[in-house]
Amino acid sequence: MLDPNTDKDVVQEIISSDSEILNLLDLESASNLEIAKHIIKRSRWDDLAGNDKRISIYFRPSRSTRNEITVAPVIQVDCHVPAKQDYIAEKVMKRVKILLHKRMVNNRPLYLESSLGELPTMPGFYCAGCRFYYYSII
């Protein structure tokens, strides 16, 4: 059954428990609370400053399918870093793709829909993102 919040929680847990991503975000020795401040489940925020790095996990509009009782929810993952560290965002997104593509989330596989390339973000920062989809019964 469709349960977007639980699905988003699982994706956040997968990403926030990966040592390579934590290393890229300079969070390898951070507390769970500090990690949760940098790997968030929403697209809107206004508190990036200095050398902050952040991953945002959120839903985009679902796609319809040929079967009226199923839907294809779309999860977007963005990485925001200081502009001079754009290569870190690209490395993070590469790792996210490896972690999530064909990964089972609540008994449903996630599939990479597309890489989004560079996305708008706050001045002085760089953002890269990608989208994943899965099929769920309504």
Residue ranges and their predicted role:
Residues 1-62, 87:
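Small/polar-rich, solvent-exposed N-terminal microdomains that initiate assembly or binding
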Residues 56-58, 78, 133:
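Residues in well-ordered beta-strands of folded domains
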Residues 50-54, 70-74, 127:
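Short connector loops at helix/strand junctions that flank enzyme active sites
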Residues 68-83:
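Short glycine-rich, basic-tinged beta-strand/loop micro-motifs
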Residues 84-105:
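Short, hydrophobic/π-rich interface segment
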Residues 1-17, 60-70, 108-138:
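Short, charged interaction patches at domain edges and termini
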Residues 38-46, 66, 94-100, 115-117:
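Generic detector of short, locally flexible boundary/turn motifs and exposed helical patches
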